[in-house]
Amino acid sequence: MQKDQLMQWEIEGELEAGIPLVPQISLLKKYIAEGNDIVLISDMYLPKEVIVKLLQKADPLLATLPLYVSSEVGHQKTTRKLFLHVYSDLDYCYEKWIHIGDNRFADQVQPEMLGIQTAPIPVPEWTPYEKRLADYSSHYEFRCVARQIQSFRLTHPAPEEQFAYCYAALYLVPYV
C-alpha cells in the first residue's frame, strides 16, 4: 500500500513538474517534416502510459510517435538490448539509423557499438544562480523552480525578460 502511494506521488510529481525541451521538440518536428521516421526510445522506470502523458503535455505530436520504454520492454539502452529490440520489432529496412540523446553512455557509446550513428544533445549547464536555488533546500519545489528558470532562460534570450522572470519575479512572490 505504501509503495503504491509513493509511486502515485512520483507519477503526479513528474506530470506536474515536467518541462518541455522546446529545442529538442523543434528538432524532431524538423526531422518529421523532412520525411524521416522517428521512434522514441527511453530508459525509464515509469510506466509507458505515464511517459505518453508527459509527451502529450510537452507536445501532442510526440504522443503519436512509436515509443519503446525499458520498463515495459524489459531491456535498456545501457545494455544495448533495447536498441536490438527496436531493430527487430520495426522490421528495420533503413539506410541508416541516427540516435539522438543526452546521456553519453546510453545514447552515444552503446548505440555506436552497434553501428548506429549518434548525435549527442548537450545537457544545459545550470547557472550559478540556478544551481544555488536548486541546492538551497531539500524541498523538491526549489529544484522545480530552478528547472523552470533554466528552461525560460534557454528559450528567451532577451536579457530584460530573463531578469524579470529569473530574478525579480521570485522576490515579488511573497507580496502577491
Please place each PLM-identified region on the residue numbering.
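Flexible inter-domain linker/hinge segments
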Residues: 130, 136-175
